[in-house]
Amino acid sequence: LDVLGGGICSGEMPVGSVFTLGDLSERFGISRTVAREVMRALEQLGLVASSRRVGLTVQPMAQWSVLDQAVIRWRLNSQQTREDQLRSLALLRTAIEPVAAREAARHATEAQRAELLEMADRLGTIGAAGRADTDDFLEVDVAFHSLILEASGNEMIVALTESVVSVMRGRTEFGLQPARLSDKSVHH
């Protein structure tokens, strides 16, 4: 599943490519039953469409479940699509987080507010020490932003948490997170 999904998401298997269950069975040395399960998973993600006489056809990205964590991971893992995926996730993040923060300011419990302040202090300390590109920083940053989304009290915003977290993890994993934060970032 990961090899095929990654191949489709990276563009190695371009839109319109056709393959069959037999092709999957032969290529990966798997049974038709397992190949059928892979086909169903790819279909559910919108990456392929099946047709009786044709087989499986790779679909355009507009058909994909682009917020699914598997699709995000496959796009991040590919050098061909990583930059576009990070840009898309960053844009989603900048669109959703200000609204989430405003709603969190209105709806957060006292415990959530206290936890956010404590995490903000920890982020400032780690970032000022030039360690904003470490797993320690990432762990606190993910918890901080996840709590903001949760505290918004809006189930639709909360449902986007994993997508927002993906860009944060991607920036650190692929060396795009600066070690030292700007003053503006420390006080966000």
Give the ranges of each region predicted by the language model.
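Short linear motifs at protein or domain termini
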Residues: 1-95, 102, 106
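Short, hydrophobic secondary-structure boundary micro-motifs
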Residues: 16-17, 51, 158-161, 177
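A short, mixed-charge helix-start or loop-turn motif at secondary-structure junctions
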Residues: 21, 78-83, 126-130, 174-178
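Conserved amphipathic alpha-helical segments that form helical-bundle/coiled-coil interaction surfaces
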Residues: 89-174
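Short, intrinsically disordered, charge-balanced linker/junction segments flanking boundaries
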Residues: 176-188
